[in-house]
């Protein structure tokens, strides 16, 4: 009979902070996308994509990390914690949807900057509203005091 170098009770696998953080983020992001699909400022085409689940949390990385002034693809990928290739795929999809465009950067004709289009800026505004709505709902679910402590703790833990 083998002996375990740890407690064989496996309940710890689904009862730790990382597990709860992942589930909370999934719920929060899903609610944000739901709010965006219904937002009156989101262009109809993007609203339909969001409502049909075609816009994923991965696409939100562009919304979350692309500065309003634009950024090089490598900088955007780094900010989102993704590879340049994975971010390039997302940018291609968002470009096809009219959310972003690639434009020349200074004197280097090879360098490109990813920037929001007018549609993308409308999407960004809806994202801001949706995040605020999801946060308000979260505060309602757990209470203001818990939400505040949670926000402060996560900010401290993440090094922010």
Indicate where each model-derived feature is located:
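Alpha-helical linker/hinge and terminal dimerization helices associated
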Residues: 21-24, 28-36, 80, 120-142, ...
């Amino acid at each position: 009979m083998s002996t375990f170098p740890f407690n064989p009770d496996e309940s710890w696998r689904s009862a730790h902070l990382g597990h709860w953080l992942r589930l909370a983020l999934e719920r929060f992001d899903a609610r944000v996308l739901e709010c965006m699909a219904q937002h009156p400022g989101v262009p109809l085409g993007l609203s339909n994509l969001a409502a049909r689940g075609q816009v994923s949390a991965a696409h939100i990385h562009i919304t979350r990390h692309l500065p309003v002034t634009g950024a090089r693809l490598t900088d955007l990928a780094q900010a989102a914690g993704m590879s340049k290739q994975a971010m390039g795929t997302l940018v291609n999809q968002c470009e096809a949807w009219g959310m972003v465009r690639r434009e020349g950067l200074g004197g280097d004709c090879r360098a490109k900057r990813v920037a929001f289009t007018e549609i993308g800026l409308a999407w960004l505004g809806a994202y801001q509203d949706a995040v605020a709505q999801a946060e308000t709902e979260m505060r309602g679910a757990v209470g203001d005091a818990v939400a505040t402590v949670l926000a402060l703790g996560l900010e401290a833990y993440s090094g922010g």
